């Protein structure tokens, strides 16, 4: 069964406002999956984003581990950011 998210009227993750780090004065929030998709299970913790504009709710895009996406960067479609990677400065994955 294909576990790619196809319905876009709901969110696949939430920002954990009480679980954050700061980089150069910018808060990055840990993400938590709200649904199962691809190899991500509901309640799995992901990496860090500055806001929802950094990670699409569509497709299988995900940020794993302690990876960070911020500063106008975006992960979309089936893009993955792993381990301790940092994506920023309007990069598109």
Question: What residues fall within each predicted segment?
Answer:
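Terminal amphipathic alpha-helical/low-complexity segments used for targeting or macromolecular assembly
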Residues: 1-58
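A detector of tandem-repeat and repeat-rich interaction/domain scaffolds
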Residues: 56-93
């Amino acid at each position: 069964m294909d576990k790619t998210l196809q319905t876009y009227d709901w969110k696949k993750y939430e920002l954990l406002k009480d679980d954050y780090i700061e980089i150069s004065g910018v808060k990055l929030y840990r993400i938590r999956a709200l649904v199962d998709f691809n190899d991500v299970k509901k309640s799995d913790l992901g990496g860090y984003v500055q806001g929802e504009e950094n990670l699409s709710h569509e497709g299988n895009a995900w940020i794993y581990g302690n990876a960070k996406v911020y500063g106008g960067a975006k992960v979309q479609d089936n893009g993955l950011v792993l381990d301790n990677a940092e994506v920023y400065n309007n990069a598109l994955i």
